[in-house]
């Protein structure tokens, strides 16, 4: 199994390790709910070094990314980041990722752990005739520091000059300091940073964060935090057979430039013109029980919806889920252990900055 540069740090913190996409990763350090609540109330630090930063450089870098991404990097200013999907020719989602624009000839993309090899292969396959260099940054570690106290804690671990600069960063902006990159991005619905730095420096940085008040958080808390924030998990909420339209991600597909042709555009437009029969939604269980991926939601007109991610919400203290359901139909229910239980359909975003949105 693959190990991140922080593997020994996790063992020292008594982490429970699990296999995630072939990586040995911490699921928790004792209490997933405590780690979740700490991110909502204070500051948690996650090892996300199983994800991969890929640098895209060259004269045709922007042209290349405008072709393989459904969002349009031409809209990005230097120093800003953008969420988007990479589609196949049938408009299915190959991956969802964040693109960071350094300048018009230099970009960085962070791809999901389970798609590291396939994404890099896709990049190479679709850049053969272009002046583009694709460099997977195998020697970078990635740490996410998240929560209302994240900025203050990170500031205490860096020089005064760096602290002043990173405090000015707005959401979805980033800045380099030598070979460290600080991005005001995250996967929790809280403020904070995702920091990319040399793998051989990350253990000391991790220790420094903990000494200054951050507490480690595992993949379990990361999953419930992102679910509360209404953020998608690749492989659970979408895959190569689903389009952005069907998963509430149509906003991330930029169709404003009619002359731009991106992979999957034709199929996407066809699907858009025909319309889709489902809608993406949040789900709240009105009684005790747990919602899980794969559960059916039954409607009074005989139609069914399906849960793609579900869990108990530590913040809201109810079971919540993300699901796709028919556009028509009322009185949704789920069947849990032989009992028919009512659920409520809500906007697919439950918590923001620690506050309930439902």
UniProtKB/Swiss-Prot annotation:
One example GO MF annotation: transaminase activity
User: Keywords on this record?
Assistant: Aminotransferase, Transferase
Q: Sorted alphabetically, which InterPro entries does this protein's record hold? A: GCS_T (IPR006223), GCS_T_bac (IPR022903), GCST_C (IPR013977), GCV_T_N (IPR006222), GcvT/YgfZ/DmdA (IPR028896), GcvT/YgfZ_C (IPR029043), TrmE/GcvT_dom1 (IPR027266)
Which cystines does this chain contain?
Answer: none
Q: Keyword Transferase: yes or no? A: yes
Question: What Gene Ontology terms for biological process does this UniProt record contain?
Answer: glycine decarboxylation via glycine cleavage system
What cellular component terms from Gene Ontology apply here? Answer: cytosol; glycine cleavage complex
| Domain of life, per lineage | Bacteria
> Reaction catalysed?
N(6)-[(R)-S(8)-aminomethyldihydrolipoyl]-L-lysyl-[protein] + (6S)-5,6,7,8-tetrahydrofolate = N(6)-[(R)-dihydrolipoyl]-L-lysyl-[protein] + (6R)-5,10-methylene-5,6,7,8-tetrahydrofolate + NH4(+)
Q: Which Pfam families match?
A: GCV_T, GCV_T_C
Q: How does it assemble?
A: The glycine cleavage system is composed of four proteins: P, T, L and H.
The function of this protein is:
The glycine cleavage system catalyzes the degradation of glycine.
Q: Which family does it belong to?
A: Belongs to the GcvT family.
Supply the name of the protein: Aminomethyltransferase
Q: Which organism is it from?
A: Francisella philomiragia subsp. philomiragia (strain ATCC 25017 / CCUG 19701 / FSC 153 / O#319-036)
Name of the coding gene: gcvT
